[in-house]
Amino acid sequence: MNESNCTKIVNFLKGMRLKTNPNLPGAKQKTPLNIHRFYLLLIIIIYTATSACIYFDWTSIRNLLLNVGKYEHLNISKYADITLSPQYKKINNLYPMTLAIHFTMSVFCGFLYDHIGPKFTAIIGQGFNILSWIFLSIDTTKIDTTLIGFIFLGLGADTAFIPILTVSNLFPDISTFIMTVIGAAASLSYAVPATLNFVYKKYPHFPFYYICYGYIFIILIPCLLVATFLLPMKPFKGLDYYLENDQESDSKNKEQISYTDNDVEMQPSLIQNGNTNVSNNVNKNKATKNIIEGENFHKQSILLFFKVLLSYPSICIIVYFILFNISTVFYGMVTDIYFSYNKSIINIINILMPISFIPCIIFGRFINKYGAAIIIIIMNAFSALMHLTALIKHQAAGLISAFLYMCAASIYTSQIYCFLLNAFPSVVFGKLLGITSLFGGMFSLFCEKLYDNISNSSGNKNDPTTISILLAISFIIMFLPLSILYTRNYEKNIESVNSEKNQIQA
């Protein structure tokens, strides 16, 4: 029995080994400057790790702004509890605002990605990022330059990040894994504000604008050059584009077999399992290839976008992301309140967030093999549990909550990106990604109201218990539509498609 279990474990681990075929048509696409796809991926990982959504680790950003004295003039007197000060509340309110701008801009970024290409979209995004740090470097109370800086930070976050996702199409047999690797690199970017904070504390005699301009010249300008010279004018073609001819021939062969052979029981896998999925993929891929090669690309792409936007998987994933976004943003805003009994847990969160790339890569491997829907269900459970365990005033429960928060944050948007890539035509990927982010970002503004309402009537204590329980109940209810999403198998699982294709050919 033990040998049997060990054999199963060994076989499972062997099955999780990742292989990529360099001879696939998608892997042979021409790259800017003819750079090898692996070198391009490495550069993109560095680009992402240093300039992606750095404000997602809000605890570190908040500490940086507090240390450099942003909004310190709002404090009329000293506060024993910093979380009750006007300065702290003003800084905290920047988070949902920036996130709302970030995800609102995503819808425009999605259209730019699909219609003017990754290169120019990323250039615009890095331009916004540079403007953001220029405004943050200005120290004045006459104009709220901090607010303006975070507006540009929100505008540039996805505009600089989404275009680089096209690199995943150079690895067609592991594209979702590559997408989560890029997402893991984005998790590494959480270390940027903590690093800047460390530098500021290490060299307190340096003005803050030295640090801001250092970040601009050392990181952001090289990233702008990467966007200019190493990103393509048009997105790299997705897997569905290259699968069309093979799937059409497979479909025709199956039809010929079904007409010539009257014994249906001799071919159950073709009739019962394969035919529906293949026909659905053929229809989707026909749309992708015809739109890309057609004369009315922009019009047909937009029409297809509105068609798939009203489908069940699209609506379900948007509703889930709205709830997930509210939950994660609210958690980030109340960490000091959740763990006021033990501040060391907050320090642990600051350590866990930069290393959240590790679970992100692990989740990415499972997504590539089993699809994103099952990981989304797991993240739904983690989101409910991280709030409930945070309410238990015990160190062990607090550590569990911090770990669950790290896991949820590690695959924050990658879970959505991978599902959209697997479930919908690649020709509308940017627009679907953008509209999903738009809804998530707009509703994140609700977190500001939630934070303002967690103070009790005495006004000297914050209690997030009621809101946390309501969020947990919402996630429990969300299990039903997500389970339907999973059981209906909307995704095009890359590894399953390849294995089924090999079986049919055999």
Swiss-Prot record:
Q: Where are the transmembrane segments?
A: 38-58, 93-113, 116-136, 147-167, 174-194, 211-231, 302-322, 344-364, 372-392, 399-419, 427-447, 466-486
Q: Which residues are glycosylated?
A: 2, 5, 75, 277, 325, 342, 453, 456
| Gene Ontology annotations for the cellular component aspect, listed alphabetically | plasma membrane
Q: Which InterPro entries match?
A: MFS_trans_sf, SLC43A_AATransporter
GO MF annotation list: L-arginine transmembrane transporter activity; L-lysine transmembrane transporter activity
Q: Which domain of life is it from?
A: Eukaryota
Annotated membrane topology is: Multi-pass membrane protein
Give GO BP annotations, semicolon-separated: L-arginine import across plasma membrane; L-lysine import across plasma membrane
What keywords are annotated for this sequence in UniProt? Answer: Amino-acid transport, Cell membrane, Glycoprotein, Membrane, Transmembrane, Transmembrane helix, Transport
KO phenotype (gene knockout): Growth is normal in asexual blood stages, however uptake of arginine and lysine is decreased. Impaired production of male gametocytes and fertile female gametocytes. Rare gametocytes that are produced have unusual membrane structures (whorls) and large vacuoles in their cytoplasm.
Q: Where in the cell is it found?
A: Cell membrane
Is Transport among this UniProt entry's keywords?
A: yes
Q: Coiled-coil annotation: which residues?
A: none
Q: Which family does it belong to?
A: Belongs to the SLC43A transporter (TC 2.A.1.44) family.
Q: What does this protein do?
A: Cationic amino acid transporter which transports L-arginine, L-lysine and, to a lesser extent, L-histidine and ornithine. Plays an essential role in gametogenesis.
Know the name of this protein? Cationic amino acid transporter 8
Recorded source organism is Plasmodium berghei (strain Anka)
